[in-house]
């Protein structure tokens, strides 16, 4: 069934509840629906339609009150957008609801897509959207006592535009009390079989939480009866920043969403912007981008490998693997001039060409790693203690992964071989040969196994980049390539003015909406950007895998021991900046 046939089927089945298709720069349809039809439409797409859409990729909001260009769209004060994916069809669909600005109300779909729970809480927290049918509306990223909804257009983007913040003793006490655990508010049981349960704050300062992150546990001895993850301690307003930084200036911020993914975080953002601009990236720039992304994938997976071993009791591997990572960072630094956050990709290409001698550095790294991985196989993956701590622990199946929006290695560990680089090749990945590692139990061990095998596949991709690096330009010959090539400046005063404006203010990106999707180190990372024809984005939405993955703890943790929880958290491989943004 094509996208057109899908739209026609939904229109025929739901009649006036589906009242318009919006043109975008994406390869999937965007439909406007009536708010009261949200539950029925989502239920049909998940459970009833042939070849269903089992994965809710994202649910987000747009404050439309300051937007000038909404041609072909119904009147809306606040728009709710849900993004669904069907792996069987290899297709997506986005549904939008128009809500009033003064009292936006939609209908919950959390009973249909369980992972909608946190997305709905975020829409309430950031935009003030209420969802009929929810048990509660608690903030998720902002402090409990925060006043207002910061992503609304009437809220300032800079701290200097707000009144001075003063932490009085009374306010400190109130904020501290607001963070105290209320089992009833969290839906936590306090007794089981007549025995009182211990309520424990696990974090936010525990080493095992891998960041500032709290899980409220209900414990019967060492057994976890219930768990409620609590996030937001690391929130920095990354999406709000996207509304005040120019399209070009925002690139360094994308490195810091998943601060271990490096340039890989730049890819989906630039995909979306380049799609809006109609820019085709040159083949050499594409290949260099892929090579650096795969080096960063190895850097991340080595850190995961060593820290998971450390979480389960092995101290030596993490030190060996940091030595390997240092070799990789030498390559990255030689090429980009930076280590963890290069900010090196550009709209339409790269910041610079490859330096002299880059190939020898890459070849040395490729020759170094395979033997090291062989050593780690015996040191970690075949280690009996490691296997005892991970095999059969925190297992889930593919259906559970879909319910909670789990993608990447966490999904592939269940036996589902979905990888965006293979299923929907982007940025030149269609030119490379590699395998997609999968597991079969979906437990901690398989999640580690998949990532270890991915290191070898990334080495294989990098080798192909090294052996077949094309010649040619590193920037697209396009008026919106940023910064514009200097060669275009050195003609007359007019070309100099255009170069100055493009380099200082940044490009004016055409009106429209576009989405970029990549297989990042943790799973599906997605940027949805809205342009109103300005030098900044009207809306920048960031869908991160870690946010979805942590939500699943409430379902998967019960029945584990506290020691098992340590292994489970390590096997998720999340980064709190990726969660909180």
UniProtKB/Swiss-Prot annotation:
Gene Ontology cellular component annotations, sorted alphabetically: NADH dehydrogenase complex; plasma membrane
InterPro entries: NADH_DH_suCD, NADH_Q_OxRdtase_suD, NADH_quin_OxRdtase_su_C/D-like, NADH_UbQ_OxRdtase_30kDa_su, NADH_UbQ_OxRdtase_49kDa_CS, NDH1_su_D/H, NiFe-Hase_large
Enzyme Commission number: 7.1.1.-
Membrane topology per record: Peripheral membrane protein
Region (NADH dehydrogenase I subunit D): 196-581
Keyword Cell inner membrane among UniProt keywords: yes
The organism's place on the tree of life at top rank: Bacteria
Pfam families linked: Complex1_30kDa, Complex1_49kDa
GO molecular function, one term: quinone binding
Record region (NADH dehydrogenase I subunit C): 1-172
Keyword Transit peptide set for record: no
Location(s), subcellular: Cell inner membrane
SUPFAM superfamilies: HydB/Nqo4-like, Nqo5-like
Catalytic activities: a quinone + NADH + 5 H(+)(in) = a quinol + NAD(+) + 4 H(+)(out)
Keywords assigned: Cell inner membrane, Cell membrane, Membrane, Multifunctional enzyme, NAD, Quinone, Translocase, Transport, Ubiquinone
Family indicated by similarity: In the N-terminal section; belongs to the complex I 30 kDa subunit family.
Subunit structure as annotated in this protein's UniProt entry: NDH-1 is composed of 13 different subunits. Subunits NuoB, CD, E, F, and G constitute the peripheral sector of the complex.
PANTHER family: NADH-QUINONE OXIDOREDUCTASE SUBUNIT C_D (PTHR11993:SF45), NADH-UBIQUINONE OXIDOREDUCTASE 49 KDA SUBUNIT (PTHR11993)
Function, in words: NDH-1 shuttles electrons from NADH, via FMN and iron-sulfur (Fe-S) centers, to quinones in the respiratory chain. The immediate electron acceptor for the enzyme in this species is believed to be ubiquinone. Couples the redox reaction to proton translocation (for every two electrons transferred, four hydrogen ions are translocated across the cytoplasmic membrane), and thus conserves the redox energy in a proton gradient.
Protein name, UniProt field: NADH-quinone oxidoreductase subunit C/D
Natural source organism: Rhodopseudomonas palustris (strain BisB18)
Upper classification of the organism: Bacteria, Pseudomonadati, Pseudomonadota, Alphaproteobacteria, Hyphomicrobiales
